[in-house]
From Swiss-Prot:
Signal sequence, renumbered to the chain: none
Swiss-Prot/TrEMBL GO biological process terms: 'de novo' pyrimidine nucleobase biosynthetic process; pyrimidine nucleotide biosynthetic process
PANTHER family tied to this protein: ASPARTATE CARBAMOYLTRANSFERASE REGULATORY CHAIN
Record note on cofactor: Binds 1 zinc ion per subunit.
Binding site for Zn(2+): C112, C117, C138, C141
Name assigned to this protein: Aspartate carbamoyltransferase regulatory chain
Length: 155
């Protein structure tokens, strides 16, 4: 079963699984890495990169057959694609659709860029970041991962 969407792009629907839509252009492969999806997986994965968005501009999109995302996976995706939407598909129909939300505090997900931070030493301390107007700030050493940096490099 294949359907064409208005701009001429043909994308196969999935029977059951998850669609991650409105991913920041160029971050689709980062989303796959966050989800641990690698070459050789036996799961059907569809990636559309830099396609026109109904909201205007461009987007990436990922479809994953027979998998529903966990909350911590959605939280990680929100860091690289804050405007993304997650749709749960059941029997070819959208069962649940909701936007991702960037958590106010991110614990144990982001690696601090400061090599001297207590979270990067041999101490058993999880990283802890808070959302800052210019990016994400480490609560231990005050290092900033700015909006200009690629947050995907620190996940």
């Amino acid at each position: 079963m294949v359907r064409a969407i208005s701009d001429g792009i043909v994308i196969s629907p999935i029977k059951n699984g998850t669609v991650i839509d409105h991913i920041t252009p160029g971050e689709g492969l980062t989303v796959l890495r966050i989800l641990g999806i690698r070459d050789g997986t036996n799961v059907t994965v569809i990636v559309a990169s830099n396609v026109p968005s109904s909201r205007g501009g461009r987007k990436d999109m990922v479809k994953i057959e027979n998998r529903e995302l966990l909350k911590d996976e959605v939280d990680k995706i929100a860091l690289v694609a804050p405007d993304a939407t997650i749709s749960i598909i059941r029997n070819f129909k959208v069962s649940v659709k909701k936007p991702v939300e960037v958590p106010k505090q991110i614990i144990g997900v982001i690696k601090c860029p400061n090599p001297n931070c207590i979270t990067n030493t041999k101490e058993p301390v999880q990283s802890r970041f808070v959302v800052h107007p210019r990016g994400f700030r480490c609560q231990y050493c005050d290092s900033l991962i700015s909006c200009e940096m690629d947050i995907g490099d620190y996940i």
